[in-house]
């Protein structure tokens, strides 16, 4: 793994977006076959590195943070990859720097490992820091499970064994994942015997070396009691998360279910869960004993990953091979659909500017009021001017404002653009800007909600995808957001009320109904 003066675009063809987070974007990359770098390598590159995932993190600091070899000079074409230290970046970049530091630890102490994502290379340019990662094209853990014709404890133990093997490797390197959940476990390929990889180390920490750089946010389903109470986080915290995953794999629902978020927090802190007879009567006692040991409130009493590698159930020796009750699979399918919707939303609202975005936009443009036909014209100009129909660069955004004859807004273009360039990739979703402007006109009520919804319903089908719901939530007026939305688990509580038929899409009526059932939103949005 090396870092040199080449540009990312010299080595890789970057294509479609695979996923987005609050601070990053992941795209598919294909290694070019005619670049000088490849010719200087060994006879041929492995197939696994020809197709990669490229994760772009916004730029760390104000200068090149990846120092070069002293003997290589400024014109060295290739040098060993170095990583920025915490001193080289501002505190605001700590989260992203943390991911790079943890990935360095993985490269040095874990890779290559069949159950941990591999980092091939790192590039840095004006757009940010690019991590060239192993491409996992086999889908998420739960997606694979619910698509199987046959599902039994044996299949569940097989995937759990792989997660345990990955955890054992990173724990041996003193790395705590801190965000273990189904969406962070991906299959390498679509093959039946594909290995399962643990990925996304953005929230991870190294014991006795780095401090966790973020607090709790979003879902608390997989969060350990010690994390919830802000106690000491250790590798045993990951084992609790594994226990939650295993419980869901064997039942189709999470172990801690409550009427509201506060009750759920208390249940987790007390370790209050049950094996309901109707669901669990067909599950082996070995599996239930394993779950009970993992979901023990005292971290010291939980088994380690190393200990679990020799557990008879994890090894498949005591896992039942009988096909599970179809109702369990059906519940797992419904749970998976809701989980993916929530995950998309939580990823989208992970930014320090999100909840103040519309408020800041109002302060920038003042009393400028867009009429409905102007908003529609703005949409048309975006589509006409922008090379990528949905995403606009700063230059394209300025061209749109000029075409719309909005000279008074042009001086603020860069600042408005920056409000919506959430992952710092140099582009913004034009629909978010449209929602922001429409929110200036209608800052509350059902009309504002419907306006934002229609901005994303581009095919006028009457429903939007889970990713679009997340983006819409991100662009809603500041006044439409409940004051406790950053409270751990609050988004879970809201999104549990959406997607009533679990089809992965949300209609306006479903979205509105969820708002009506949530008193904190109802008072503000629908009053």
Swiss-Prot record:
ATP binds at residues 18-26, 55. It is found in: Membrane. Residues 408-443, 444-479, 486-521 form the EF-hand domain. Changing residue 24 to F: In DK22; loss of nodulation and mycorrhizal infection. SUPFAM superfamilies: EF-hand, Protein kinase-like (PK-like). It is a single-pass membrane protein. Residues 358-379 form a coiled coil. Residues 41-51 have a biased composition (Low complexity). GO terms for molecular function: ATP binding; calcium ion binding; calcium/calmodulin-dependent protein kinase activity; calmodulin binding; protein serine kinase activity. Ca(2+) 3 binds at residues 499, 501, 503, 505, 510. The keyword Ubl conjugation does not apply. Keywords: ATP-binding, Calcium, Calmodulin-binding, Coiled coil, Kinase, Membrane, Metal-binding, Nodulation, Nucleotide-binding, Phosphoprotein, Repeat, Serine/threonine-protein kinase, Transferase, Transmembrane, Transmembrane helix. It is an enzyme of class 2 (transferase). Residues 25-51, 59-78 are annotated as: Disordered. Residues 337-350 are annotated as: Calmodulin-binding. Ca(2+) 2 binds at residues 457, 459, 461, 463, 468. Its EC number is 2.7.11.17. Belongs to the protein kinase superfamily. CAMK Ser/Thr protein kinase family. CaMK subfamily. Protein kinase that recognizes the calcium spiking induced by Nod factors and translates this signal to components controlling nodulation and mycorrhizal infection responses. This is Calcium and calcium/calmodulin-dependent serine/threonine-protein kinase. It comes from Pisum sativum (Garden pea).
């Amino acid at each position: 793994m090396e870092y040199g003066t080449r540009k990312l675009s010299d080595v890789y063809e970057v294509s479609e977006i695979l996923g987005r987070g609050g601070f990053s974007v992941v795209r598919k990359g294909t290694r070019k076959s005619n670049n000088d770098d490849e010719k200087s390598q060994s006879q041929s590159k492995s197939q696994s590195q020809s197709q990669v995932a490229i994760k772009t993190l916004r730029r760390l600091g104000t200068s090149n943070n990846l120092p070069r070899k002293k003997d290589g000079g400024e014109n060295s074409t290739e040098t060993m990859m170095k990583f920025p230290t915490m001193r080289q970046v501002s505190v605001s970049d700590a989260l992203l720097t943390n991911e790079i530091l943890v990935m360095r630890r993985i490269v040095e102490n874990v890779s290559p490992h069949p159950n941990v994502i591999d980092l091939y290379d790192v590039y840095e340019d004006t757009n940010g820091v690019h991590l060239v990662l192993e491409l996992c094209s086999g889908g998420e853990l739960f997606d694979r499970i619910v698509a199987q014709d046959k599902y039994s404890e044996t299949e569940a133990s097989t995937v759990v064994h792989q997660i345990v093997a990955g955890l054992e490797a990173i724990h041996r390197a003193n790395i705590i994942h801190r965000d273990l959940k189904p969406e962070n476990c991906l299959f390498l390929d679509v093959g039946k015997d594909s290995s399962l990889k643990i990925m996304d180390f953005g929230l991870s920490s190294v014991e006795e070396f780095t401090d966790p750089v973020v607090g709790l946010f979003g879902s608390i389903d997989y969060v350990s009691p010690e994390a919830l109470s802000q106690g000491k986080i250790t590798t045993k915290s990951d084992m609790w998360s594994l226990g939650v995953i295993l419980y869901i794999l064997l039942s189709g629902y999470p172990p801690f279910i409550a009427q509201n978020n506060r009750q759920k927090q208390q249940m987790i802190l007390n370790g209050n869960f049950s094996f309901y007879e109707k669901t669990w009567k067909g599950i082996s006692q070995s599996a239930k004993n394993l779950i009970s040991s993992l979901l023990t409130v005292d971290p010291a009493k939980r088994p380690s990953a190393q200990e679990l590698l020799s557990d008879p159930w994890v090894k498949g020796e005591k896992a039942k091979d009988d096909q599970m009750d179809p109702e369990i699979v059906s519940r797992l399918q419904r749970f998976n659909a809701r989980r993916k919707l929530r995950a998309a939303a939580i990823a989208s609202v992970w930014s320090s500017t999100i909840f103040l975005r519309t408020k800041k936009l109002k302060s920038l443009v003042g009393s400028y009021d867009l009429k409905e036909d102007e908003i529609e014209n703005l949409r048309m100009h975006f589509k006409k001017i922008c090379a990528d129909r949905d995403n606009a660069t700063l230059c394209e955004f300025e061209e749109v404002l000029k075409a719309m004859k909005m000279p008074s807004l042009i001086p603020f273009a860069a600042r408005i653009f920056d409000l919506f360039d959430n992952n710092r990739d140099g582009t913004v979703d034009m629909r978010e800007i449209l929602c922001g402007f429409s929110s200036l006109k209608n800052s509350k009520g059902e009309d504002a909600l419907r306006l934002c919804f229609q901005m994303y319903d581009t095919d006028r089908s009457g429903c939007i995808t889970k990713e679009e719901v997340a983006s819409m939530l991100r662009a809603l007026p500041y006044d439409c957001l409940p004051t406790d939305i950053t409270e751990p688990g609050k988004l879970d509580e809201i999104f549990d009320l959406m997607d009533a038929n679990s089809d992965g899409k949300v209609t306006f009526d479903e979205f509105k109904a969820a708002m009506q059932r949530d008193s904190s939103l109802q008072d503000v949005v629908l009053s």
